[in-house]
Amino acid sequence: MRILVSNDDGIYSPGLWALVKRLKEVGEVIVVAPDREQSATGTQVTLRQPLRVQKTHPLIPGIEAYAVEGSPCDCVILGLAKLITEPVDLVVSGINHGLNLGDDVLISGTVGAALQGYLRNIPSIAISIPVTMEEPENLDSAACITAEVARRIQNGDITKNSFLNINIPDLPLSQIEELRVTPLAHKTHIETVEEGHDGRKRYFWLRRRQLSSADNKKTDIWAIENGYITISALHERLFQQPVFTLKDAETAGILAAARSCQDKI
């Protein structure tokens, strides 16, 4: 099994190398990761400037590693298209320092990187662990869970077209009661804008805080808040065609109104 590993925390993130340590027991691992932190970049792809790549010294001997001046999505696209010459069997992104739950997957660079594998028909995993004021203490718990999921994909126990989002408490596995398959929760957020002045110009900080979390026991948020590992199959949630219909008269009316508006210019 050939595994491309990326992340959004940067190529020297402890979470990435904890993951590599366990995944190399499953197959051949190649690292293609950003040369610096790229959190909350979502599905950003660099189109207006060249991507520069440097083969770099791995923190684990024997691992082929590349640092990319680009986003997590850039890394996976470039890795699959140019840097890895043999077919890749699995894309894994993480271990992210910070959970990716509910609607937050839409802005996650970790999930965005895994998405690039899935869009190219490669099973893909995003793995995250919570962060408070200190670094996570149990990165190996997340790495071991990911390695086991990778084995099951390899063996055919988990479908080959999977796009999985895994979140795990920062605990030893012996203290985690259960792993649950969960749907994504819907979270309510508010963005606040803080203003400052550097002596010459105004500047702004965007701050995001969660107003409410799901109390539904079936969702990923409830499960992680209650000490469970969560696995969510994102391909079923993000790409399912929503129910949305318009009558022919309504579609014609929209087009006619738009044409009328344009004629007035």
Swiss-Prot record:
One of its GO terms (cellular component) is cytoplasm. Binds 1 divalent metal cation per subunit. SUPFAM superfamilies: SurE-like. Pfam families: SurE. GO terms for molecular function: 5'-nucleotidase activity; metal ion binding; nucleotide binding. It is found in: Cytoplasm. Its cofactor is a divalent metal cation. It catalyses: a ribonucleoside 5'-phosphate + H2O = a ribonucleoside + phosphate. Its EC number is 3.1.3.5. A divalent metal cation binds at D8, D9, S39, N96. Belongs to the SurE nucleotidase family. This is 5'-nucleotidase SurE. It comes from Dehalococcoides mccartyi (strain CBDB1).
